Amino acid sequence: MDTPSPYGLRFQPTIWAALGNLLLLGIAFLLFLGRKPGAFRSQALMDLLPGFYTHVFNFSLSYLLLAGVGFLWLMMGVAVRHVAWAALALAMANLAYEFLLTLLNTRDPVDAAYGIAGTACAFTWLWGVQRFGLRPNPAT
């Protein structure tokens, strides 16, 4: 059993990439929790962008999906172009949901823009991680 498993993680993140990913996932989740009035709602953010918390669900969901799955994919050795295709599919799904699917949904281009922004932020982060934050896993 000297040969490594082809299903293992081919790369391991540097400490800054791992902590940064957890921090950014936590921030996206806190933004999501701010939808309801309470401790997680930022008055400064509401003053800067008055309708922010009515659209933040799309941003948070898109960010959490792509950054969560994409980070694991990069550690598994999936090429960044495949992560880019997933980001494009997620952006297109945001557009399709907000413009074409009217069942249980009202058309809202601002929601689509927030979803695309969350996807773009996640892909930018993942591109940086792939470029600067991964090193080969010595166990494989």
Q: What residue spans do the PLM features occupy?
A:
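Bulky hydrophobic segments
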Residues: 1-140
